[in-house]
Amino acid sequence: MGADHTAGYAVATNIMKVGGDVDPLKSEGQVALSRDLQVTTAAVDSTGMCLFIAFAVMDQADTFQALLDLITAFSGAPCTADDVANLGKSVLRNERDFNMRAGMTNKDDRLPAYMLKEKLAPHNIVFEVTDEELDQVHNY
């Protein structure tokens, strides 16, 4: 909840190509990538597992199945990929609801203005995701 360097850890996909391939220098695909990674991270965190397993889980079907088997063994109920996604979405909805009740709004999801204006070397780009696109991160 709040700023978290591990939630929506797009570096994994943008740079290391784990779980897909999205160009880190373009805005296209970043919102969906962030949303999906936040869902995954919330689910993995809820199991008590460290985020580091996410890299293996995203790229190796056998490892993902091992996570499902572990959750099934722990809970006593069969666990599917949809169940894991729904767990992550539920966590994020609860966090979002808490924040909204605490008085936060979409304006609190915005990055500092300088990130929209000051070019970052060595690629000389700025954050180009619009507010409207950014608001879509919370559409699970």
Task: Label the predicted regions.
Residues 1-140:
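Extended C-terminal regions of large enzymes
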